[in-house]
Swiss-Prot record:
GO terms for cellular component: plasma membrane. ATP binds at G72, R73, S74, G75, C76, G77, K78, S79. The lineage of its organism: Bacteria, Pseudomonadati, Pseudomonadota, Betaproteobacteria, Burkholderiales. PANTHER family: ALIPHATIC SULFONATES IMPORT ATP-BINDING PROTEIN SSUB (PTHR42788:SF17), TAURINE IMPORT ATP-BINDING PROTEIN-RELATED (PTHR42788). It catalyses: ATP + H2O + aliphatic sulfonate-[sulfonate-binding protein]Side 1 = ADP + phosphate + aliphatic sulfonateSide 2 + [sulfonate-binding protein]Side 1. Keywords: ATP-binding, Cell inner membrane, Cell membrane, Membrane, Nucleotide-binding, Translocase, Transport. This is Aliphatic sulfonates import ATP-binding protein SsuB. Pfam families: ABC_tran. InterPro entries: AAA+_ATPase, ABC_transporter-like_ATP-bd, ABC_transporter-like_CS, ABC_transporter_ATP-bind, P-loop_NTPase. Residues 40-260 form the ABC transporter domain.
Length: 291
């Protein structure tokens, strides 16, 4: 995902803030959802841009509290699908339903992007508390504590590292008690160590709070570390739905983890089998030798 211009970033943050205020004005609707995850049903969804079909009759389901990761090559349609689930765009055919009700932009859904979209003129705690009535600001402080930033509450966003900014964005999403959290490559701009730390934090909060999660990522290892299922989209179609039954927390160095990662990676890279891959490698080596 491309980084946005500072002015555009501020505008997007302002939009997020106003959406949060709108949702905060609907306490009855929010309370009616209860707690825990929400069921997601994507049925025969089609999406076109300028006459070109980018999603072809996609079907996807997530049970309440399930963590589903979507992987695939750039341009395959995975972020488009997430935007449709978020209600940021409309499908040309098919339907998205949450707990059996038509999707839209309900207060039970929050999105976390690669860009934290923090308001630069508000301190960290105030960024988390956007849209909350003053009596709920203690909730914002509690979420900051849960993401490990209680001591940075009065800092300006500009003084935070990239990983810290994403922790604030995560707290801001979760303070509204979403039943569905949509993660659009939220860790893509972070260094490897910070990324692993954030993965552990997201998993910990997901297990504690019980929301349904839908993650879009290019990182197959990240998908397997976090998800109950890894879904592969190729050319606008779901071509793999891989269960991940490994015990949590996941250990990347194990043979079982590596086997699932290899299975998904080979599908992403469109390699049919280890034998086919080895044969291709030997063929290329022979070509290089003869050249």
């Amino acid at each position: 995902m491309m980084h946005t211009h500072p002015v555009e970033q501020a505008a997007l943050a302002w939009l997020d803030a106003n959406l949060a205020r709108r949702d905060a004005a609907r306490p009855a609707a929010r309370a009616s959802h209860g707690v825990g995850g929400i069921a997601l049903h994507v049925e025969q969804v089609v999406k076109r841009y300028n006459g070109r079909e980018v999603l072809h009759g996609v079907n996807l389901r997530a049970a309440p509290g399930e963590f589903v990761a979507i992987v695939g090559r750039s341009g395959c349609g995975k972020s488009t699908l997430l935007r449709l689930v978020a209600g940021l765009e409309s499908a040309d055919a098919g339907a998205v339903a949450l707990d059996g009700q038509p999707g839209g932009t309900p207060s039970s859904v929050r999105v976390m992007f690669q860009d934290a979209r923090l308001l630069p003129w508000k301190r960290v705690l105030d960024n988390v508390a956007i849209g909350l009535p003053r009596e709920r600001h203690a909730d914002a402080a509690a979420l900051l504590d849960q993401v490990g930033l209680a001591d940075r509450a009065n800092e300006w966003p500009a003084r935070l590292s990239g990983g810290q900014r994403q922790r604030v964005a995560l707290a801001r999403a979760l303070v509204h008690h979403p039943r569905l959290l949509l993660l659009d490559e939220p860790l893509g701009a972070l260094d490897a160590l910070t990324r692993i730390e954030m993965q552990a934090l997201i998993e910990s909060l997901w297990r504690r709070l019980g929301f349904t999660a839908l993650l879009v990522t290019h990182d197959v290892s990240e998908a397997i570390a976090l998800a109950d299922r890894v879904v592969l989209i190729e050319d606008g179609r779901i071509t793999l739905d891989q269960q991940v039954t490994l015990a949590r927390p996941r250990q990347r160095g194990t043979a079982d983890f590596a086997q699932i990662e290899d299975t998904v990676l080979r599908r992403v890279m469109r390699q049919e089998s280890p034998a086919a891959s080895d044969a291709e490698l030997h063929f290329r080596s022979a070509e290089e030798f003869l050249s």
